[in-house]
Design a protein with these regions (language model features):
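Glycine-rich phosphate-binding active-site loops on the catalytic face of alpha/beta enzymes
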Residues: 1-5, 38-50, 81-113
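Alpha-helix-loop-beta-strand connector modules within alpha/beta enzyme cores
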Residues: 1-22, 50-78, 111-114
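Residue-level detector of anion-binding/catalytic polar loops
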Residues: 35, 69, 90
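Electropositive, surface-exposed helix/loop patches at the edges of structured domains
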Residues: 32, 36, 75-83
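Hydrophobic/aromatic ligand-binding patch that stacks against planar heteroaromatic rings
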Residues: 28, 62, 83
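Structural motif
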Residues: 32, 65, 86-89
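Histidine/lysine/aspartate-rich catalytic loop segments that bind and position anionic ligands
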Residues: 16, 20-48
Length: 114
């Protein structure tokens, strides 16, 4: 669904657009006044099939051309999240590391992200 249709249905709710690793999609998201831009997958993940990985270069490009918050997604865990924050990601979307972690409970997994 495009963002214009989503806005009609959801009114003033927060709406984001996943742009994968595409500068073109980032520009479209900005033009369509999205509330946040998601970029990824940055790392291997079992959550979704990923055709190609997102790059730090794309994250930095998005940060350079917009003030819209950037959410990074895909395979983020305790050993790689800092690289994304150091490169100006506003938010981290972390799922499998927390909920499907075979070594740590969700609470302990979250605590390792400090």
């Amino acid at each position: 669904m495009n963002i214009k249709k989503a806005r009609k249905i959801l009114k003033n709710k927060t709406i984001g657009i996943t742009c994968h690793n595409s500068k073109k999609l980032i520009k479209e998201a900005i033009h369509n006044k999205t509330d946040y831009i998601a970029i990824g997958s940055f790392f291997y993940t079992k959550t979704k099939k990923v055709k190609s990985r997102a790059s730090i270069k794309t994250l930095l490009y998005a940060k350079k051309i917009t003030k819209i918050p950037i959410v990074v997604i895909g395979g983020i865990k305790d050993t790689n999240y800092k690289k994304l924050l150091l490169n100006k990601a506003n938010f981290l979307a972390i799922s499998s590391y927390i909920w499907n972690n075979k070594k740590l409970s969700p609470v302990k997994a979250i605590r390792k992200l400090k």
